[in-house]
């Protein structure tokens, strides 16, 4: 009996440092069985969090209110375009003005924040449920949704049976003067260059397309979607899947299809390294990857959590690499402008 107690005592002595270390582990990387209990308790004490995001204004209540109702934690939202969110987060970090708790916008921009040490690493069990490529090795952000570029058409101008089946079909003369594109979609352009042959062959595809059929560039996906609805742009090459779907549900003469593989970029959630309300930010991070995933589907977004059915189930998707997008942004922006935008008469 005494020998057994001595063995138990020795075992506990060996375990003590590990247990102590676990108890002192920051919540963001804590992996104990009571992880969520700790996060929720600490978050409720903080009572609030500030979110910087690019999520559409009309979609925010659908995503934010359920979180507030479930946990009794108020979310203060500052919403702006991608560039403004990035600039504000970087400027405040540089000035050591720590106001933001969580950030949600494009993954390439999230990677830029990570490189400037604005975000903190997070370890979460939900990561294993996310689509491949959703979490970078440094764990400083996690993709929540995919913005999938699809093709939208005016149903009064274009017949469904006439739609192109492949990217190469866009070279058919029947599309002359009917194509539109968003003027800043170099990520889509980069991916399709690879899809249709890569390198000079891929670039030649776009040069031929512009020369033969022309492409009308428009700034803003919402504007491009509206121009499809009006019939001014019969076929748009790059709108996000949820935009024509939402317009269609309201009775607009628009529908969409996907040339495969469809190209997608991800939006992601990150927790600020110096968040004033770190636990609340972490809880919101978990919420966006779990409960909010079905809410995103209700808004026609494509979720990254593979346990949630996708509105684009069955469509082959090619996910852009956010790190490559960031590192090669200047190169592909120039190629896109030189090959498509400038030659399109912009």
Report each predicted region and the residues it spans.
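A bilobed periplasmic-binding-protein/Venus flytrap-type ligand-binding module shared by bacterial periplasmic
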Residues: 150-157, 193-195, 265-280, 296
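Immediate post-signal peptide segment of exported/extracytoplasmic ligand-binding proteins
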Residues: 23-50, 68-69, 171-177
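Periplasmic-binding protein-like
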Residues: 175-185, 287-308
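A ligand-binding cleft/hinge motif common to bilobed small-molecule-binding domains
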Residues: 108-112, 234-253
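Bacterial N-terminal signal peptides that target proteins for export
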Residues: 1-13
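Short beta-strand->loop
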Residues: 119-128, 139-143, 235, 248, ...
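Extracellular/periplasmic bilobal clamshell ligand-binding domains
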Residues: 310-346
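Extracytoplasmic ligand-binding site segments that recognize negatively charged/polar headgroups
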Residues: 50-65, 76-93, 97-232
